[in-house]
Regions:
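Canonical helix-turn-helix DNA-binding module
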Residues: 44-78
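A detector for short, charged/polar N-terminal pre-domain segments
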Residues: 1-9
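Short, charged/polar surface micro-motifs in flexible loops or helix N-caps
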Residues: 35-39, 62, 89-90
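C-terminal regulatory/oligomerization modules of transcriptional regulators
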Residues: 94-139
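A conserved beta-turn-beta hairpin within the catalytic core of GNAT-like acetyltransferases
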Residues: 7, 39-40, 77
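Basic, amphipathic "hinge/linker" alpha-helix immediately C-terminal to the N-terminal HTH DNA-binding motif
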Residues: 22, 75-98
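N-terminal helix-turn-helix DNA-binding core of bacterial DNA-binding proteins
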Residues: 12-52
């Protein structure tokens, strides 16, 4: 993974995006924060994707360094860290939605819930409002 100072600045928005969050594990972490309510290291580790501990730790650190997520100590258990999307991270929700919709359309074995696909396609603003973390501003 590229640290923020190593992101290629060739002016291409796609290159910037891919260098900022474009690998498989980073996108799945963002998905899980947005749609599955994950917030702890254990949530991601036990999420069913099979991510290894070293890759998970690396991606969480990378996403934090790039301003996509933040981490804070859990007030109920100071040894546990709570991860949350920043405004910059939440702004990736439409990207995740579009990947989700594209896959739901073209993957013959999709397990995407039909209700969620329909809401992403037809009522995106309502879905964004529903999943927006309480601490983030409104747009």
């Amino acid at each position: 993974m590229l640290c923020p100072s190593k992101i290629r600045h060739n002016g291409c928005p796609v290159t910037y995006a891919l260098d900022s969050f474009g690998d498989r594990w980073s996108l799945l972490i963002i998905r899980d924060l947005l749609l599955r309510g994950f917030s702890t290291y254990g949530d991601f580790l036990d999420g069913g994707e099979g991510i290894s501990t070293n890759i998970l730790a690396d991606r969480l650190k990378f996403l934090e360094a790039n301003g996509i997520l933040s981490k804070t100590p859990d007030p109920e258990n100071r040894r546990r860290i709570i991860y949350a999307l920043t405004e910059k991270g939440f702004d990736l929700a439409p990207v995740i939605f579009d990947l989700f919709l594209w896959s739901a359309q073209y993957d013959p074995e999709t397990k995407a819930p039909k209700e969620l696909v329909e809401k992403m396609a037809k009522d995106r603003e309502s879905l964004l409002a529903d999943i927006r973390p309480a601490g983030l501003g409104t747009k």
